[in-house]
A protein has these predicted regions:
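A carboxyl-terminal module marker
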Residues: 2, 445-449, 469, 473, ...
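Mobile "lid/hinge" segments at catalytic clefts and subdomain interfaces of large enzymes
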Residues: 117-130, 139-142, 155-164, 305, ...
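Beta-rich nucleic-acid/ligand-interaction surfaces
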Residues: 40-44, 207-209, 270, 462, ...
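Phosphate-backbone binding interfaces of nucleic-acid-interacting proteins
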Residues: 1-211, 346, 363, 369, ...
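Glycine/proline-enriched, intrinsically flexible loops and inter-domain linkers
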Residues: 4-5, 23, 28, 40, ...
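Terminal amphipathic helices with adjacent charged low-complexity linkers/tails
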Residues: 187, 191-223, 398-427, 434, ...
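Conserved mixed alpha/beta core segments that line enzyme active sites in large multi-domain catalysts
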Residues: 49-79, 249-250, 254, 261, ...
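Extended, well-folded interaction surfaces typified by the phenylalanyl-tRNA synthetase beta subunit core
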Residues: 420-424, 428-586, 738, 791-796, ...
Length: 824
C-alpha cells in the first residue's frame, strides 16, 4: 500500500525524515518495503530554464524551421533551431539546455548539441507535453516576457514540488492500517513512546444531517445485518462534475491512482485517507430508489468494462427496477457511475460482510481497493465520518452543490467495542521482561485502548471496534510489546535447548528428499499442483469413484470443487500445457496428498478427521521422448518398462526388495488394458502403474502415450522403516551366469518365473533377469518365449560345473512343473 509522506504529516505532527518514518513504522510491525521520491512533474524540470527569444529567422534550408537566438541568462545567447509554428521574437519560452534529460512516459532522452539542416543548435524550445506540464503539443510554451527573467529555473517558475511514497506491506489482520490516518495513528503511538507525545488528528467535516429526517431517495435494505451491518448515505444536488483541482489530482497520482472527475476522485481520496470505501450513484440512473439485495442469476458490466456473471449469493445495490448498479464492496456498474452530465448523486458509505465480499471478488476475478479493505473486516462505526468528509470536499470543490434532505442510516445492530481482560503479570511472563505499569497504560492509551478498570493484576480494557485483530489478552500484549519496542526487550542470560531423537516424521521427510534428489538427477522435473480438482474429471471412473470425492462446501469455482483422489490429473494438465508449447520430453514427479471419503475411518489423532482418508502420495509421469534425436541417436520414446525401472530404483534406494512385494496385473479404468501393481503380502497397496487410457488423454488434448505410476507413500514409508542396514564383505568368488529359453503360456509373468526360481534355489541364486521376449510367428497360439538369465554365486568357494548344472536342473524342473514350460 502506498503512503504519501506529505499527506501523512497532515495527520500527525512530526519532524522525522521519510527514511526515519520508514524505520519507525517497520519497528512497530508496519514493514516498509521502500521509499521513493515522487515529483509533481516527472524529472522535476531539472536543466530547464526560462529564456527570452531575441531573434527569430526562417531557416535557409527549410520553410518550416526557424533559427532563433535565446537569452537564457548566460554570458551569450544560445542559437537554437525550432520547428514550432508559434515561435517569435520577444516571447518568453522554456529552454532545455545541453545535457538536460527529458522524460516522456517511460522513455528519456538527453539534449545534445546538434546540426539541423546545416545549422548548429544548442538546445531545444519545449512544449507542454515534452516537459510534462500539460497536454498541448501544437506548439512551444509561450510565457509573459514582462513577468519572467531569463535564466530562471523552470522548476521555480512552475512550482515543482516533490513528495515521498512509502510502500507499506500491510499484513492481512491490520485492516485498521490500510489508510493514511490508520498509519498516522500507529506512528503517533510510536512518537509518544519516544517522548514526543502527540495524537493523530482528522480534518474538520460538516456535521452529519440527522438520520431520522427523510432522505429524498427511498432506500430498502432487503438483507439481514449479517450481510450488510450498516448502509448509510445522503443526496447531493446541484453538481457540476468537473476536473479535480491540481492538489487533488497530484495527490492521487502520487498514490498511483488515475484522476477521473471530482466526485470519483474525492471518494478515492477519502478511501486512502480514512480507509472507508465509498460509492457515488448518479441519481438519474437509479430510477429514484435504491435497494440492497441479493442478485439474480444475471450479467453485469462493471466499471472496468469487464462482464461479471452474478449469482444469487452476490450482494448488490440495485435500482428501482431491480437492475444491479453496484456489486457491494467490490465495484460499481458501468452505467451507474458519475459523468460530466451528472447533477445529482446518492453518496454511499456502507459496511458489508467480509466473507461475502471476498467470495464475490474471487469469483469475479476482481481485486479493488474497496474489496481489499472489506475482505479484511471494517468497523461499521466509522462510515459516518467518511461520508461527511467526502460530502464536505464535494461541496467545497463544486460550488452551488448542496445536501438535500436527511441522511439514510440503516444500522440495526450497532457494533460494540471488544472487552478484554489483561493480567499484567501474564504480560511480563509472555514478553519476558517487566513492563512498568504506567508505561503499559500509556501505550494502551496511545493506541486508543481504554482502561475501564485497573486492579493490581486484572485490567479491564475496551478495545475500539476497528482493531479487529485485538480481541484476546495475547493480542493486547502484542500491541504493548510492538510499541514498547522489540529491540528494547533484552535477551535472556539463559540458553534453553531441547534435544530430541529423530522421529518417524523426520525420517520420512529425509527419505522424500533422498528420492526427490534421485528423480531430479534422473532428469525428472517436480510438479506442484493444487489439491483442489474438478468433479468432472472423475465422471464414470470406478477406480476413483465420484461417491468417494470430498466435496468443498464453498468452492471458488466449478473447476475447483473437490479434493483430488489421485495426482494423475494434475500431471496430465502439465503435460498438455507443455505439449502446446512444443516441448518433447515429459518426465515429472509430484509429492502430494490425495483425499477420499471413507465412512469407516474414525478420528484417531488431532489431524485425522472421521469419515475421511488422506494419503501421502508420490506420482511419476513418463511421456514423450526418452532420447531426442541427434547426430548420435534417433528419437527413442518413453516406454512402460522405463517407468517400471524408475519405480524399482525407488524401491532399491529405500532398501526394499521387489521380492518382498506381491506383483500382479490388476483391472484399472485409468489405464489401457490392465495396470500393474505392487502390494504387501497382507494386501496394502504400494504401487499402481500403467499406460493412461487414451479417452482420459483426449480430455487434455494429449496425443502421445503417457505412462503413470502412483506410489502410496504412507505404506511404502512403513516398509522402509522396517529395513535394516546389513554390512557384508565384498564377494571374493565369481558370479556364474546361465541362460534358459522357455516356451510357456502367454499369461505367465516374468515376476512369477523369478519367484519360482528363487523358491527352488534359495541359497546360491543371486538374481534373475529377462533379456528377451518373443510372441508371434512360429509359436503355438497362446504361447510366448522368455529368455532368462540366472546369476549364481557361492560366497565361500568357486562353484563347480557339476554344482551349477544341478542347481539349473532344479530350477528348470520347478518352472516346468509349475507352469508347464518347455525348453526351446
Amino acid at each position: 500500500m502506498n503512503i504519501s509522506y506529505d499527506l501523512l504529516r497532515s495527520y500527525v505532527e512530526m519532524d522525522l525524515t521519510p527514511d526515519e518514518v520508514a524505520a519507525a513504522l517497520t519497528s512497530i510491525g508496519l514493514e516498509v518495503g521502500g521509499v521513493e521520491e515522487v515529483e509533481s512533474i516527472p524529472g522535476g524540470l531539472k536543466g530547464l530554464v526560462i529564456g527570452h527569444v531575441l531573434t527569430c529567422d526562417v531557416h535557409e534550408n527549410s520553410n518550416h524551421l526557424h533559427v532563433t537566438t535565446v537569452d537564457v541568462g548566460a554570458e551569450a545567447p544560445l542559437q537554437i533551431v525550432c520547428g514550432a509554428p508559434n515561435v517569435a521574437a520577444g516571447k518568453a519560452v522554456v529552454v532545455a539546455t545541453i545535457g538536460t534529460v527529458l522524460t516522456s512516459g517511460d522513455e528519456s532522452f538527453t539534449i545534445k548539441k546538434s546540426k539541423i539542416r546545416g545549422v548548429e543548435s544548442f538546445g531545444m524550445l519545449c512544449s507542454e507535453v515534452e516537459i510534462g506540464v500539460g497536454h498541448d503539443n501544437s506548439g512551444i510554451i509561450l510565457l509573459d516576457a514582462a513577468t519572467t527573467k531569463p535564466g530562471t529555473p523552470a522548476a521555480e517558475h512552475f512550482g515543482v514540488s516533490s513528495d515521498y511514497v512509502l510502500e507499506v506491506d500491510i499484513t492481512p489482520n491490520r485492516v485498521d492500517a490500510t489508510s493514511h490516518y490508520g498509519v498516522a495513528r500507529d506512528l503517533a503511538a510510536y512518537l509518544t513512546q519516544q517522548g514526543k507525545a502527540t495524537k493523530a488528528k482528522l480534518p474538520e467535516v460538516l456535521p452529519a444531517p440527522a438520520a431520522g429526517t427523510a432522505c429524498p431517495v427511498p432506500v430498502t435494505v432487503a438483507v439481514d445485518e449479517t450481510l450488510c451491518p450498516r448502509f448509510e448515505g445522503l443526496v447531493i444536488r446541484g453538481l457540476k462534475v468537473i476536473e479535480s483541482p491540481d492538489w487533488l489530482r497530484r495527490q492521487l497520482e502520487t498514490l498511483g491512482l488515475r484522476p477521473i472527475n471530482v466526485v470519483v476522485d474525492v471518494t478515492n481520496y477519502v478511501l486512502h485517507e480514512f480507509g472507508q470505501p465509498l460509492h457515488a450513484y448518479d441519481l438519474a440512473k437509479t430510477g429514484g430508489a435504491l435497494s440492497v439485495q441479493l442478485a439474480r442469476e444475471e450479467k453485469m458490466v462493471l466499471l472496468d468494462k469487464s462482464e461479471g456473471q452474478l449469482t444469487e449469493r452476490d450482494l448488490v445495490i440495485a435500482s428501482a427496477t431491480g437492475e444491479p448498479l453496484c456489486v457491494a464492496g467490490v465495484m460499481g456498474g458501468l452505467d451507474s457511475g458519475t459523468t460530466e452530465t451528472t447533477t445529482d448523486i446518492f453518496l454511499e458509505s456502507a459496511n458489508f460482510n467480509a466473507t461475502s465480499v471476498r467470495k464475490t471478488a474471487r469469483r469475479l476475478a476482481v481485486n479493488t481497493d474497496s474489496s481489499f479493505r472489506f475482505e479484511r473486516g471494517l468497523d461499521p462505526n466509522r462510515t459516518t465520518w467518511a461520508l461527511m468528509r467526502a460530502a464536505s470536499l464535494i461541496l467545497e470543490l463544486c460550488p452551488g452543490s448542496y445536501i438535500d434532505g436527511g441522511r439514510f442510516d440503516h444500522y440495526p445492530v450497532p457494533a460494540q467495542p471488544y472487552e478484554v481482560t489483561l493480567r499484567p503479570s501474564h504480560m511480563d511472563a509472555l514478553i519476558g521482561k517487566f513492563i512498568p505499569r504506567d508505561e503499559a497504560a500509556r501505550i494502551l492509551e496511545s493506541l486508543e485502548i481504554e482502561i475501564v478498570s485497573r486492579e493490581e493484576d486484572a485490567w479491564q480494557l475496551r478495545v475500539p471496534r476497528y482493531r479487529i485483530d485485538v480481541t484476546r489478552e495475547a493480542d493486547v500484549i502484542e500491541e504493548v510489546m510492538r510499541i514498547y519496542g522489540y529491540n528494547n526487550i533484552e535477551l535472556s542470560g539463559y540458553v534453553h535447548a531441547n534435544l530430541s531423537p529423530k522421529g518417524a516424521n523426520d525420517r520420512s521427510y529425509s527419505r522424500r528428499i533422498l528420492l526427490s534428489e534421485q528423480l531430479t538427477g534422473a532428469g525428472f522435473n517436480e510438479l506442484l499442483n493444487n489439491s483442489l480438482s474438478s468433479e468432472a474429471y472423475y465422471e464414470g471412473l470406478t477406480s476413483c469413484p465420484a461417491d468417494k470425492l470430498v466435496q468443498l462446501v464453498n468452492p471458488l469455482s466449478s473447476e475447483l470443487n473437490v479434493m483430488r483422489q489421485t495426482l494423475l490429473f494434475g500431471g496430465l494438465s502439465a503435460i498438455s500445457r507443455n505439449l502446446r508449447r512444443q516441448q518433447k520430453s515429459f518426465y515429472y514427479y509430484e509429492w502430494g496428498n490425495c483425499y477420499a471419503a471413507a465412512p469407516e475411518v474414525e478420528r484417531s489423532t488431532a489431524t485425522t478427521l472421521a469419515g475421511y482418508r488422506e494419503t501421502q502420495t508420490l506420482g511419476l509421469w513418463v511421456a514423450g521422448a526418452r532420447i531426442q534425436s541427434s547426430w548420435a541417436h534417433a528419437d527413442e520414446p518413453a516406454s512402460p518398462f522405463e517407468l517400471k525401472a524408475y519405480v524399482l530404483h525407488i524401491l532399491e534406494r529405500l532398501g526394499i526388495s521387489e521380492r518382498s512385494l506381491r506383483a500382479e496385473f490388476v483391472e484399472c479404468d485409468l489405464f489401457t488394458g490392465r495396470g500393474y501393481s505392487y502390494a504387501t503380502y497382507d494386501g496394502k497397496p504400494v504401487v499402481l502403474m500403467g499406460q493412461v487410457k487414451s479417452a482420459l488423454l483426449a480430455k487434455w488434448d494429449i496425443d502421445i502415450p503417457v505412462y503413470y505410476a502412483e506410489i502410496n507413500w504412507d505404506n511404502l514409508n512403513r516398509l522402509a522403516e522396517r529395513v535394516k542396514i546389513e554390512i557384508a564383505d565384498l564377494p571374493k568368488f565369481p558370479v556364474v551366469r546361465r541362460d534358459l529359453s522357455l516356451l510357456l503360456d502367454e499369461k505367465i509373468t516374468f515376476a512369477e518365473l523369478a519367484e519360482t526360481a528363487r523358491r527352488a534355489e534359495k541359497k546360491l541364486l543371486r538374481d534373475v533377469t529377462l533379456f528377451d521376449v518373443y510372441e508371434g510367428k512360429n509359436l503355438p497360439a497362446g504361447k510366448k518365449s522368455y529368455a532368462l538369465s540366472f546369476y549364481l554365486q557361492d560366497t565361500e568357494r568357486t562353484m563347480s560345473d557339476k554344482q551349477i548344472d544341478a542347481i539349473m536342473a532344479k530350477i528348470r524342473k520347478s518352472i516346468e512343473d509349475t507352469y508347464g514350460a518347455t525348453l526351446r
